[in-house]
Amino acid sequence: TQIEKDLKQQLYSAEVDKIKSYMIDNSTVEIPDEYLQARLNEYIASFTKENVKDGQTLKKYLKSNYNMTVDQATEKWKENLTDQIKTEFIFGLIAEKENIKMDDDAFNSYVDYIVSASNGQFSKASEVYKYFGSGHKDEGKTYLKNQYLVNKAIDTVTEKANVTFEDGTAAPDTSSGSADAE
């Protein structure tokens, strides 16, 4: 049923979140300041383009929609990007060490899914690439290919991991066809 599928996905997401947190907390990752700043600048530009309309400023948009200053939002975005970049670095290295390779058909399906799930924001793959490349298709495609490999590495680790939750219970097996809920 759909409820079982949703529950299975929620459990899998909880496992992935726990694994990502564990890996970040137990790894030493150096992010070059210039790289973090470049990613932050790209994020701010993209956020502004997507959200700030009709002559409104980022400052006014953040204040009216989030009750935050630009500095507060920038600090929060920087924290989130730091974890995201650490995840990309860690699982990118795992993909390399585990010899996880690009499957072009699966990658194209991944991009097609992004197009179909975009609620009309994208109508073709080139628009997705351009969006994720901050206007540069080739950079966006490279970024998405890296993300795809990172996600495959996360899936590989999740399949092999023995995840337990705060209450000490093991995560249910989400690889089988059903998920049991109590």
What does each model-identified segment do?
Residues T1-E182:
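Extended, charged alpha-helical "arm"/coiled-coil substrate-binding scaffolds
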